[in-house]
A protein has these predicted regions:
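Membrane-interface helix-loop junctions in multi-pass transporters/channels
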Residues: 1-131
Length: 131
């Protein structure tokens, strides 16, 4: 890959990252504000939703053949990579353990992993049925 193409790829990912991170903040905050509970529902929702969308797009982007590597990177790495929050998830779980909220932390970890993988599988299979 030449320098110009690589730079365009990096810029595509960066723009997608800005979109995904901003979307994550807006959606996560809105969902969290609906709850009086300290459980991180907003982050959980973003991780599951992002996994669902990635599952739906993963096959369709590959099969459609109309998307360039830059568009795939823009969506998958940029938007969805910054929309889902695994590093923030890890910190949130650690802080729960540190506060002594062991049960809440374990429930959060299990739900995050199981529902995110389920969302990915569901998204993949829904679009496989359609296309």
């Amino acid at each position: 890959m030449n320098k110009a193409r690589k730079m365009y790829l990096i810029i595509s990912i960066a723009i997608g990252g800005a979109i995904g991170a901003t979307s994550r903040y807006i959606i996560s905050t809105a969902i969290q504000n609906l709850s009086s509970n300290a459980f991180p529902y907003g982050m959980l929702a973003c991780n599951v939703l992002g996994s669902l969308i990635l599952g739906m797009l993963y096959d369709s982007l590959a099969k459609a053949g109309i998307f360039t590597d830059n568009i795939k990177a823009f969506i998958q790495i940029g938007i969805l990579g910054s929309f889902t929050t695994f590093s923030a998830f890890s910190l949130e779980a650690f802080l729960m353990f540190e506060k002594g909220d062991h049960i809440t932390a374990i429930v959060f970890i299990l739900l995050s992993v199981l529902l995110s993988i389920s969302g990915l599988v569901l998204g993949l299979n829904v679009l496989r049925l359609v296309f």
